[in-house]
């Protein structure tokens, strides 16, 4: 048995005990883990500095370095995230339904842990603590396979988290980090279906598609975010400008950032210059269709869009701009190019708002609000394991309940089937 298989086998062996831990023990571990992160701040931040320096030497994108970087405030946020998870109600053991059959059988549906969760992710150290917290609270063992860019940071974080397990006499097989960074190990991990119940990829389109195509373990896709804001002909201009500015520039490197603007032709000539002036404060580049380019002619950072722009998740200070002649055309365009993540309409027309809500195919659909709210904390779920863009098992921000399954519990008094 090689090192990878042993990690997976140990988690599989521990899954029953972890799945039946008392809530008080789980909460104690999570609070201790939060304390340990802060106690290990020096070691974690020094490890992170090494990873960031390597990324900068390798000329990695600014958006990637932003996701990778930790400081005191971000580490404090990770610790607070664990404490918030500890405060959430424990879903494990919840009786979801109970009914008595005519033959006297009492059949109940009880929420249980999934078992062993595998997570493959890129340069997001906060995923390490969030994933542990959510999986542990729901009685799951978790095996993490982070990207090479964050390896030193992840090792330091996992060391601090594991101490909370061992100090509370809980098997440290509840949390494992695959430290090998080679692609062969990742490919082998994706095929450990005899031990791992579900695999969740967190990262860019390339990573997610690689996992979906090659894994033999069931996959929950946490998709890329080609998110749109459609500005309807009856939109409030100031509201639309503020929403788009927030959705794009508050944090560019996240999957719920807006990447594309769709504008009704009836207002485009008046609205687009106002929007341009606001986005110009952040040096946002606009890749425009022919009509939008004509309206913004002569302005800096305005270029012609290519066919690739409409489906692009930039994660950068770049947006595509499309002008349409109707809400139907807007919906058709968005459904054709979106990634089923988060889409928004800005409008004062109730009927158009309802049409957009009903016909847009996405996990999160907004009326008059920023797509940046697609987040477990903002939805009141606590931390999230990711935002699912698929329709089976989980969709949208994945909180605690998304990391559970259920079993049927049947009480009898000697019944036999005739």
Swiss-Prot record:
The keyword Phosphoprotein does not apply. Its main location: cytoplasm. InterPro entries: Ald_DH/histidinol_DH, Ald_DH_C, Ald_DH_N, Aldehyde_DH_dom, G-glutamylP_reductase_CS, Glu-5-SA_DH, GPR_dom. It is found in: Cytoplasm. The gene is proA. Keywords: Amino-acid biosynthesis, Cytoplasm, NADP, Oxidoreductase, Proline biosynthesis. It holds the Pfam family Aldedh. It catalyses: L-glutamate 5-semialdehyde + phosphate + NADP(+) = L-glutamyl 5-phosphate + NADPH + H(+). It comes from the Bacteria. NCBIfam families: PRK00197.1, proA. It comes from Agathobacter rectalis (strain ATCC 33656 / DSM 3377 / JCM 17463 / KCTC 5835 / VPI 0990). Catalyzes the NADPH-dependent reduction of L-glutamate 5-phosphate into L-glutamate 5-semialdehyde and phosphate. The product spontaneously undergoes cyclization to form 1-pyrroline-5-carboxylate. One of its GO terms (biological process) is L-proline biosynthetic process. One of its GO terms (molecular function) is NADP binding. GO terms for cellular component: cytoplasm. Belongs to the gamma-glutamyl phosphate reductase family. Pathway: Amino-acid biosynthesis; L-proline biosynthesis; L-glutamate 5-semialdehyde from L-glutamate: step 2/2. Its EC number is 1.2.1.41. This is Gamma-glutamyl phosphate reductase.
């Amino acid at each position: 048995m090689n090192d990878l298989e042993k990690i997976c086998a140990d988690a599989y062996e521990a899954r029953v005990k972890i799945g039946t831990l008392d809530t008080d023990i789980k909460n104690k571990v999570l609070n201790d883990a939060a304390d340990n992160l802060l106690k290990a701040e020096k070691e974690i931040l020094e490890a992170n500095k090494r990873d960031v320096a390597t990324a900068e030497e390798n000329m990695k994108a600014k958006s990637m370095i932003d996701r990778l970087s930790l400081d005191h405030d971000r580490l404090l946020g990770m610790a607070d995230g664990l404490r918030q998870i500890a405060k959430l109600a424990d879903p494990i053991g919840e009786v979801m339904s109970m009914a008595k059959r005519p033959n006297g059988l009492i059949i109940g549906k009880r929420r249980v842990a999934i078992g062993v969760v595998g997570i493959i992710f890129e340069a997001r150290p906060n995923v390490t603590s969030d994933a542990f917290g959510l999986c542990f609270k729901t009685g799951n063992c978790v095996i993490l396979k982070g990207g090479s860019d964050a390896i030193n940071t992840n090792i330091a974080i996992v060391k601090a988290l594991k101490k909370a397990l061992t100090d509370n006499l809980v098997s440290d097989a509840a949390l494992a980090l695959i430290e090998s960074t080679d692609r062969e190990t990742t490919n082998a991990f994706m095929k450990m279906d005899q031990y791992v119940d579900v695999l969740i990829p967190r990262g860019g389109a390339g990573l997610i598609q690689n996992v979906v195509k090659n894994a033999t373990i069931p996959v929950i896709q946490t998709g890329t975010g080609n998110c749109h804001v459609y500005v309807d002909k009856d939109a409030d201009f100031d509201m639309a400008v503020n929403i788009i500015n927030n959705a794009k520039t508050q944090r560019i490197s996240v999957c719920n950032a807006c990447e594309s603007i769709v504008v009704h032709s009836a207002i485009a000539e008046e609205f687009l210059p106002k929007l341009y002036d606001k986005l110009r404060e952040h040096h946002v580049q606009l890749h425009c269709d022919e009509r939008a380019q004509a309206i913004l002619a002569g302005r800096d950072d305005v270029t012609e869009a290519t066919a690739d722009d409409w489906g692009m998740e930039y994660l950068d200070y770049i947006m595509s701009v499309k002008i349409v002649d109707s809400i139907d055309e807007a919906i058709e365009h968005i459904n054709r190019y979106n990634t089923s993540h988060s889409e928004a309409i800005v409008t004062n027309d109730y009927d158009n708002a309802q049409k957009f809500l009903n016909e847009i195919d996405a996990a999160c659909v907004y009326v008059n609000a920023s797509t940046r709210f697609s987040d477990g904390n903002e939805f009141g779920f606590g931390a999230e394991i990711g935002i699912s863009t698929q329709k089976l098992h989980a969709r949208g921000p994945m909180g605690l309940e998304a990391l559970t399954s259920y079993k049927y519990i049947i009480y009898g008094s000697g019944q036999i089937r005739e």
